[in-house]
C-alpha cells in the first residue's frame, strides 16, 4: 500500500449545484487545493484530482502526500469513482477521508467519525458498498436540519441562507483544518481537537 492519503469531497456535478449544502465537501477540497496551490485535472476514474503535500509534518518536513478528489458523478453513485481512485492510487481504507455535508451536526460545526453507519447519507452508502468496507474516516461538515417540515432531500439541494453564507468561509476553513490535522497528526488527535468544547 502507498503512504499517500485520498481525501474525497462529496458533491454533485454542474453549476446549478456548486453552492448548495450538498456540495460543501467539494468547497472544502477547493480550500485545501488553494492552500497548497494544487490544480485539479480530470482523472480516468471519473473524478477531478489534485496531488498535493498537505501542511507541515512535525520537525518542519513537508506534510504527507495527499490526493484531493472530487467525483464527477452524482453523489448517490460516487462509490464507483472512490473505489477506483483508492485502487489506482493504492490507498488503503485507513488512509481514506471523505468530507461531506451532515444534517445531524449543527450548522457551523465540524465532527470526525471513523466507520459506522451512513446516517441516511446516500453518498456514504454508495462508497461503503463499492469499497465493501465502512472503516474510512469522515469529516462531517454541519449543515443542520431543515426548518419546519421541509424535506431534507430538498434542503440539501438548496443554497445556504444569506445569514449562513456570511459564516461559510469559517466553516469551510475549519473543515479544511480538520482534514489537515487528521492526515498529519492522526484521527484521534484531530477528533479530540474538533470535538473539544469551545
UniProtKB/Swiss-Prot annotation:
Family named by the database record: Belongs to the PTH family.
EC identifiers of the protein: 3.1.1.29
Location in or out of the cell: Cytoplasm
Name assigned to this protein: Peptidyl-tRNA hydrolase
GO terms of biological process kind: protein quality control for misfolded or incompletely synthesized proteins; rescue of stalled ribosome
InterPro entries referenced in this protein's UniProt entry, alphabetically: Pept_tRNA_hydro, Pept_tRNA_hydro_CS, Pept_tRNA_hydro_sf
Source species of the chain: Kineococcus radiotolerans (strain ATCC BAA-149 / DSM 14245 / SRS30216)
Site entry (Stabilizes the basic form of H active site to accept a proton), positions: 101
Binding positions (tRNA): 17, 74, 76, 122
